[in-house]
C-alpha cells in the first residue's frame, strides 16, 4: 500500500503524527513493512482530546520501541491553519537538523490532493498547480515523502477497522469555517465517493502531462548565490524558482509570481532578489542599495548585473568572481 518503500528502507525517517485516522494508518503500515521511524506530534491545546492523542502517541512509541517527540504550542489567536502549519514544520525541521533525519513522512492522501486541486482550480491555476502535492518532494536538507498519496481516506479507514487499530477523530475537521473543510465536505468527498477510480486515473495523467510540459531544472549554488540556466520558458523558470523557495520553506505569493512573468528583477518576501542575468536566473539575498567600491561597481556594470543584485555580490567576492566566470 505504500509508495516509494525503497526510499524509506535503511533511512532515518521522521513521521509527522497526529493520532488521527491518516497518520495512524501510515504508522501501522510502516510497522507492517518493517520500516524504521520515529514520530513527532504537536499539541495545540485547543481540545481536551489533544492530551489523549499525545498520550496515545507516547504509548505507541513505548510499545513499538521508537522515539516520540512532543511540542506544546502556544495559543494561536488568529489565522490558525497557516500559523499551525508554520509551527508544525518549524518543529519537524528542527528535529531533522538535530537528529539528522533523511526523510519527513506525512500522511497526505488522495482526498487531500484532490481538495488542493479543486482549491487551486477555483483560484486560477495551470496543470502544474492542479497536479499539486507530489509523493516525493526534495527539500534543502531532507526529502518530504507522502507514501499514501494514491489512497483515499476510506481505504485507510477500512485498513484500520479491519485490523482493529485505535485512532482519533478531530471534530474540527468538520468545521466549514476553514476553507479546506468546506471544499472537502461539499465537493471533494462526494466526488471521490462516486468517481474514485476516474479521479485516480486523472492524477496519473496530470503527473504525466507535467513531466512533458515542464522542464526539470536543477538549481546550483555558490555561497548564497543560487542560479540556473534559463530554459527560455517563463513558465518553467518560474516553477523552478517556486520549487527552490519551497525547498527552503518559503512560499512565493500569487502577486510575486505575476511580477516574475513581466519583470526582469523581483524582490521576494523583502529578503531575496530574483533576476534574469545574462543566460541565467539568479537568486541572492536582497541588500538595500549601499556604497560600492568603484572597481567592483564598474565590474558589475560591465557584467550587466541587475542593480538589485549588486549590493550582495559586492559583499561576496567569491560569488562575484564565480558569476564573472559563469557569464564570460
What are these regions (language model features)?
Residues 149, 172, 176, 195, ...:
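Generic alpha-helical structural element
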Residues 121, 148-151, 190, 206, ...:
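Generic structural signal for hydrophobic core residues of well-folded globular domains
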Residues 182-199:
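Conserved anion/nucleotide-ligand pocket segment
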Residues 123, 127, 192-196, 250:
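Alpha-helix boundary/capping and short turn/kink residues
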Residues 6-11, 18, 138, 203-328:
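AMP-forming adenylation/ATP pyrophosphatase catalytic core
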Residues 1-185:
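Core alpha/beta nucleotide-donor-binding catalytic domains of modification enzymes
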Residues 81, 194-198, 292-297:
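Short, charged, solvent-exposed linker or helix-capping segments at domain edges/interfaces
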